[in-house]
Design a protein with these regions (language model features):
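Short loop/turn segments immediately following beta-strands, especially the blade-tip
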Residues: 195-202, 306-307
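Short glycine/acidic-enriched loop and turn motifs that connect beta-strands
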Residues: 56-58, 96-97, 142-144, 189-191, ...
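Beta-rich, blade/repeat-based domains predominating
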Residues: 33-48, 54, 73-93, 98, ...
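A short beta-strand motif characteristic of beta-propeller blades
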Residues: 28-33, 66-72, 110-117, 159-165, ...
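Bacterial N-terminal signal peptides that target proteins for export
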Residues: 1-12
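Flexible "stalk/tail and boundary" regions
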Residues: 45-48, 62-64, 68, 85, ...
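A short loop-to-beta-strand structural motif that recurs across blades of beta-propeller domains
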Residues: 58-60, 98-100, 149-152, 191-193, ...
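Blade-level signature of beta-propeller repeat domains, shared across WD40, Kelch, NHL, RCC1
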Residues: 276-307
């Protein structure tokens, strides 16, 4: 997809130029946790940042001063956390194929193990709550190629139904502010899809929203990961670089509602898989990974000025 240079308000993608290299990191970056073990899936809720540490099998909180363990669930392999309308929390348990449940105090509750038709969840990954009290989530699919990714929907009454399949490593997911569009990342295809959301939560009219190869005009895939949408409808796309020398490592891409690149944010880490907004959206909380080749997948949690 072609972009206008007039709207690239941060760095342009002339990545080998001196100007681009000088723009490798944003100002005002703050480290909130410098010993995170594969941090992922954050959300701001009731005055705290909730996020997971996959390699610690833990849900963490940051209250503005310190990081604390909120809940642990050995074998889960948490990838994201989200509150429900019933005062519980859910986690995507990537390793054991369940949707973990926690009480408001962090106590582990019996998990969701399948949908209403008996479909299992292979590699649960990320959440997207809607305005009806329901929550969409992705199931990445069977490694290594993950060609059987899916999207499920947890209704407010706790029932779970399959809504979309045939996704190639389904990953980040987000609902548009008007509740009419669902965006889904296909990491292995380096693209972001969109679906029309029906009144009953059904998905239809599957379309390509943006191909990241076209967006970046670079030969190396960025492997898109998490996706979030702000109050202006701007779409933030994280990424998980799979090589250590990728020029676009640490970059969050921000596009408008038609997929045109607006700007980028750059963090001093290799992977920036996911993020969450502060209530006023002036701060972006970013989970990042520096050690991508082996456990404990050391990373950081950052805050960065937004806009």
């Amino acid at each position: 997809m072609k972009t206008s240079t007039s709207i690239l308000r941060a760095c342009t993608f002339i990545l080998l130029s001196a100007a681009a290299l000088a723009c490798r990191a944003e100002t005002g970056v703050r480290v909130l946790n410098d010993d995170a073990h594969y941090p992922e899936g954050p959300i701001w809720y009731q005055g705290k940042l909730y996020y997971v540490e996959y390699d610690r099998n833990a849900v963490m909180t940051w209250d503005g001063k310190k990081n604390s363990v909120f809940s642990s669930d050995k074998g889960c392999g948490q990838s994201a956390v989200v509150p429900t309308v019933h005062g519980e929390f859910l986690t995507t348990c990537y390793d054991n194929g369940t949707i973990g449940r926690m009480a408001a105090d962090g106590k582990v509750l019996p998990p969701y193990t399948h949908d209403k038709d008996g479909n299992k969840f292979t590699g649960p990954n990320d959440f997207a709550p809607d305005s009806r009290g329901g929550i969409y989530f992705t199931a990445s699919g069977t490694p290594p190629d993950a060609l059987d990714g899916k999207v499920f929907y947890i209704a407010a009454d706790g029932s779970i139904a399959l809504k979309a399949g045939d996704l190639h490593n389904a990953n980040g997911i987000a609902v548009s502010k008007d509740g009419k569009i669902l965006y889904v990342v296909e990491t292995n295809e380096n693209r972001l899809l969109k679906f029309r959301i029906g009144p009953d939560g059904s998905l239809s009219d599957r379309q390509l929203f943006v191909n990241l190869d076209d967006l970046t005009h670079h030969v190396v895939h960025i492997y898109p990961d998490g996706v979030k949408i702000d109050s202006r409808g701007e779409i933030y796309i994280g990424q998980s670089a799979r090589e250590t020398n990728v020029p676009l490592a640490g970059v969050i891409f921000i596009v408008n509602a038609v997929g045109v690149l607006l700007r980028q944010l750059t963090l001093p880490s290799l992977q920036v898989p996911n993020f969450a907004f502060s209530p006023d959206e002036k701060t972006l909380y970013v989970t990042a990974v520096d050690q991508i080749d082996k456990s404990p997948f050391l990373g950081k949690v950052y805050s960065i000025p937004n806009r």
